[in-house]
Amino acid sequence: CWEVQGQNCCKCEKCYRTMANIMAEGENPKRFNFPLFSEKNTGIQMRNYLYHKALDKEKVSDNWPFISKRVLENRDKLKELPYWDSFKWICKVNFADPYSFGVPLNYRLKHAKGIRGKLSQFKFYRKLHDMKCGISIND
């Protein structure tokens, strides 16, 4: 971990990425020195973290699409594991598009900045904005 010396913080991108790799192979990250791993919440926290990175146009590691591919390959085995429900979002996400993360609208509204940021969370507003800017809706 880059954030905490001598242990894993379980909250930085490197920890999330390593836990995701471990989870993608069907293992429990607690067995690999990630003491704060939660079968119920870690996948959701990971998704929200990456959503904010994408929203702020911050670069994340190029490994995420490979992790997603590995999850798809192991999906049948992973569906049996207790963390699958909080982790299955990774199969559908486009890591460059914050809106593909499937983050619930109420969470997006709570964390959006300003009225324009809140309005931009609604699909109809994005379509209106695209029409105003001359962007084709079918793109």
List each model region and its residues.
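Nucleotide-activated chemistry modules centered on ATP-dependent adenylation/adenylyltransferase
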Residues: 1-139
